[in-house]
Every structure is written in C-alpha cells, then in structure tokens.
C-alpha cells in the first residue's frame, strides 16, 4: 500500500491511498456494507451512481454467513459482490461483543456464540486475519479488546495492553504471510483517558500500514471524543493513514478532519435514510412529515444525486408511507451522495488551503434549519 500526503492545512490532511483495487482520495467516507453490500444498494449503485472507491464489510457477519471459505471459493469479496473498488473489513470483535450476548474474553482471543444459531466460535488475532485473507480484503483490521464508556481505569489499561499485544502478534503473523495486497491497520484504544491513549500508541508497533482510533462514539460526550482525537492523532505516524472508526455525524467528521483524521465509516447516512431522515446542506429533514405530501421539489435544490435529479419530496414521502422498498434505495443514494460530496469538498478545500473557512460556512448553513 502506498499513501501519499498531498496537502496539509493546519492539521487537516489531503492524500492519496493506493490499494490493489482502487486509488482512494482522502479524506474518505466509507459506506458500510455489513453483509457485503450497502443495505438496499448494489455494486452498480456504489460504482456508477455514487462513485465510491472504498466500502466497509463486516468480518463477523461474512464469517458466520455465508462463510469466508465460500467467499474465497467464489473469487473473494470483490468478485462475489461485483464491486470493483476496494474493501476494508473490520476484525469482527465489536459484533462479537455487541451481538452475541455471551462473550468470554481470554488472553489469546474471544469466545462468542453466533447470534444466528448459537454455535460457539473462537476469534484469535491470527484467526481474524485468516478470515480476512479469504475475503481478500484490501484493508484488514486487527482484533482488539473493546471497552464501553465510561469504564474504570484498570479496565482501560487491561484493554490497551491486550489490544496492543494482539495487534503486534497480528503484525508478526501478517509479515510471515507475505501478502502485500492485504494491508493491516492497528487500532488504538484507551477510552477518553489521554494517558491511556498515549500508552496505547507507545505499546503498538510502528510497522502497520495504517492506524485506527477505536473505542469512541460508545457513550462519551462529543467534547470528550474530540479532545481524545486531538490528543491521539498527532501521536500517530504522519506518513500513514488515520482512521476514526464508526463516526459519525457531518459535524463529527468535519471536526475530525480538522484534527488530522483521513478515513471514516458510519451507518448513519443509510440507517437514517431508511428511517425517513434525509440530509441537506440546510440540515436534516424528516420526509414522513405531512408538509411533504404535496411538495413537488427535490430533496435539495441543486443536488446532483440520482434521487434529486428525478424525484420529488412528495414521491419519496409517498414511498415511505407506502413502505415501498424503492424508498430505501432512493433515500440511501441521496444521503450517501451528501456524505461523499461533503468529504470530497472538504478535500478540495484542504488542497486550496481554505478548510477552516469551508467548515465554518458548511456548519453555519447546516445548522440554519432542520425540518
């Protein structure tokens, strides 16, 4: 993997990430395709309509169903899903904790039960890499020990030491495999305790292809989250991409870009779309509300997305009320277009050394009105 920094504006960074299946301009927002697809959308939607170059798939879900060996036999994730961009896959640790309800944490891995059939499974640092090799992920995440917030200091320290140990074991295992097209990212933990974040960085080896800031958006305040990012990002290698996991709102993303983060993922644009909330530059609207029943205008004037160029708010209001599946597709296309355009415009602003003024103008308009 090759990562080139093209511009730095204060702390905000613009770069190019060269992966086996695509070149990705950063900052980048990665749509979340848990089961190998973004809910209600297919590969054509992602490539030809949205122009997405990098999407996230979930190791835990692909391992349990259809099984990583099935995906491998069918040509890997890219051929299986017919998506010709790149895939980042997470380690599955978060889902093992959040979905199984019966997790046993051990020094060498995680024992969990499938949320599908109750069968027992064991994830180790090497096991999750083997799964991701079978998926042929462009970017693989290490197994880490997740902690919900708030958490006692002792638990945070235990988490970062275990996560660093697993990350370093993963790196050693990965080096033995000699698979240059499957890149490995470490995950920095430590909650909102800044000394714990520093210790996590210190304990994690420096030979990874990229570094993620994990363990945020799990119960802390926005101010605590931003303080943690501001402290952690400068500690990471400057020549490697920085990934903020599972965040978030447009405000969160722009704030994190200003603090030096390059990569983001979140279910928010698609989940909100399915629940009638649509993003516009003037704030969010709830398309199920009665005033949109006769509104013949697009979701947003001057929006170039597939839905806005063709359909009215009244039509989307009708589709949502009628529970038509087409609603989820059109709404998701709009919200993902909004997010992808936002980070694209943020990148252009960084290249032109005007990011802070772009961010200020964007957020002033975004907060001006929500319906």
Curated annotation (Swiss-Prot):
It catalyses: 7-aminomethyl-7-carbaguanine + guanosine(34) in tRNA = 7-aminomethyl-7-carbaguanosine(34) in tRNA + guanine. It comes from the Bacteria. Zn(2+) binds at residues 303, 305, 308, 334. Its EC number is 2.4.2.29. Its cofactor is Zn(2+). One of its GO terms (molecular function) is metal ion binding. Residues 246-252, 270-274 are annotated as: RNA binding. The active site is at 90 (proton acceptor), 265 (nucleophile). GO terms for cellular component: cytosol. Binds 1 zinc ion per subunit. GO terms for biological process: queuosine biosynthetic process; tRNA-guanine transglycosylation. Pathway: tRNA modification; tRNA-queuosine biosynthesis. Keywords: Glycosyltransferase, Metal-binding, Queuosine biosynthesis, Transferase, tRNA processing, Zinc. Substrate binds at residues 90-94, 144, 189, 215. The keyword rRNA-binding does not apply. Homodimer. Within each dimer, one monomer is responsible for RNA recognition and catalysis, while the other monomer binds to the replacement base PreQ1. Catalyzes the base-exchange of a guanine (G) residue with the queuine precursor 7-aminomethyl-7-deazaguanine (PreQ1) at position 34 (anticodon wobble position) in tRNAs with GU(N) anticodons (tRNA-Asp, -Asn, -His and -Tyr). Catalysis occurs through a double-displacement mechanism. The nucleophile active site attacks the C1' of nucleotide 34 to detach the guanine base from the RNA, forming a covalent enzyme-RNA intermediate. The proton acceptor active site deprotonates the incoming PreQ1, allowing a nucleophilic attack on the C1' of the ribose to form the product. Belongs to the queuine tRNA-ribosyltransferase family. This is Queuine tRNA-ribosyltransferase.
């Amino acid at each position: 993997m090759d990562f080139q920094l093209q511009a730095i504006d204060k702390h905000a960074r613009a770069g190019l990430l060269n992966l086996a299946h695509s070149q990705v301009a950063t900052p980048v927002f990665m749509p979340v395709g848990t089961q190998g697809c973004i809910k209600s959308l297919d590969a054509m939607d992602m490539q030809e309509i949205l122009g997405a170059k990098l999407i996230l798939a979930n190791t835990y879900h692909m391992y349990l169903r259809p099984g990583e060996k099935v995906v491998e036999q069918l040509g890997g994730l890219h051929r299986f899903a017919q998506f010709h961009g790149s895939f980042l896959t997470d380690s599955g640790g978060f889902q093992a904790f959040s979905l199984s309800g019966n997790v046993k944490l051990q020094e060498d891995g995680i024992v969990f039960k499938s949320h599908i059939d109750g069968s027992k499974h064991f994830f180790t640092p090497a096991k999750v890499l083997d799964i991701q090799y079978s998926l042929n992920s462009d970017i693989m995440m290490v197994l880490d020990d997740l902690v919900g917030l708030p958490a006692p200091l002792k638990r945070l320290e235990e988490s970062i030491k275990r996560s660093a140990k697993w990350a370093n074991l993963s790196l050693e295992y990965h080096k033995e495999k000699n698979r240059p097209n499957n890149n490995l990212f470490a995950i920095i933990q430590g909650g909102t305790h800044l000394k714990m974040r520093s210790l996590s960085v210190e304990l994690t080896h420096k030979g990874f292809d990229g570094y993620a800031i994990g363990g945020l958006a799990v119960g802390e305040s926005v101010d605590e989250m931003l303080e943690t990012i501001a402290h952690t990002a400068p500690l990471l290698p400057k020549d490697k991409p920085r990934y903020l996991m599972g965040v978030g709102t447009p405000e969160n993303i722009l704030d994190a870009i200003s603090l030096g983060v390059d990569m983001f993922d979140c279910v928010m644009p698609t989940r909100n779309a399915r629940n009638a909330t649509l993003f516009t530059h003037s704030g969010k609207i709830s398309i199920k509300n009665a005033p949109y029943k006769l509104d013949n205008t697009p979701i947003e004037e001057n929006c170039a997305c597939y839905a806005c160029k063709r359909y009215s708010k009244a039509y989307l209001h009708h589709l949502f009320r009628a529970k038509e599946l087409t609603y989820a597709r059109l709404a998701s296309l709009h919200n993902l277009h909004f997010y992808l355009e936002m980070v694209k415009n943020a990148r252009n602003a960084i290249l032109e050394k005007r990011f802070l003024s772009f961010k200020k103008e964007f957020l002033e308009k975004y907060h001006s009105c929500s319906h």
